[in-house]
């Protein structure tokens, strides 16, 4: 019998649970899978399955993440949950598991705590666009007024980190009581148990409040140049993987980065020795360009839709500095440090001008294992945009991972 084909009937959204340690992120993840499994939209996963998350490597950094998938009536979700706080920080900065939205879990017994705030700040800086809040452990709060006060405090915290605190849905419940009810009776249907219903309610809010992301193919075309060669009598070919968008023969594209921006026309597209009319995100392709010499292009430039991305030299970034167990530095570094910044396909030297802590106070020293905000100035302009990921390298080894939070120049 032929294998069943993956049917893409529903739009796909990547989400994750974020929040302070022990507020119930993993319990909630398990409860969601069990609740949706009762409706036939998931394979139920136990807490221990999710908690013993396997190690993965992203940009040379080891991260523990658990991936679960489930479906609601409207969507297919991939959901990421990280067991440890350090894993969250690394995951958000490296973009190992991209998130289109997040479920912020806050314990009703504690309210917003330091990591709640840190995850919100990170979500804002790395571009997690939308958040829904689950106010957990509602059964431990005896007073309805206290719940209202907690909700106010959460909304104020959201506002502080530039999320729309007034609009964001806050659903209260108990992930543990829902999970216990579902473990006892995996067939629990909507209406059978008030705690399980709260999980369904949460997922309805996630369905309606977190917008379906724009697909990669609908974004403006961009391809980082990996290699260049010339074909006698035909012109110059740039090869690489299309990062987003699509490109057709006859399109005008810009060569951005390292030198002055140059405009050219696509005269041919090739993939696996076959010619194409159009190439889309994910394709490894050779693009034949009109009127461009081989010496005009080098690895590290990008080909992009005109006006969609600009060359920059100075930016602010959120960076995680690897500790020595992760293969990073053994010693601290200071403002003025000049490592290599590996962006897309190339290394560019840059100078780290200054470091700032979360509260914007200047810091003079950064230790391995720290997360820090830094201002970087590159020696050559390259195509940079907010939300872009990069690695920091020194002598060929990765010493940090970062994401651009603001463009300065």
Swiss-Prot record:
Coiled-coil ranges from the UniProt annotation? none
Q: Mind telling me which SUPFAM superfamilies this protein's record contains?
A: EF-Tu/eEF-1alpha/eIF2-gamma C-terminal domain, P-loop containing nucleoside triphosphate hydrolases, Translation proteins
Q: So what does this thing catalyse?
A: GTP + H2O = GDP + phosphate + H(+)
The Enzyme Commission number assigned here is 3.6.5.3
Molecular function terms from GO: GTP binding; GTPase activity; translation elongation factor activity
**Region of interest: G2:** 60-64
> Which keywords appear in this protein's UniProt record, sorted alphabetically?
Chloroplast, Elongation factor, GTP-binding, Hydrolase, Magnesium, Metal-binding, Nucleotide-binding, Plastid, Protein biosynthesis
Q: What does this protein do?
A: GTP hydrolase that promotes the GTP-dependent binding of aminoacyl-tRNA to the A-site of ribosomes during protein biosynthesis.
Protein name, entry field: Elongation factor Tu, chloroplastic
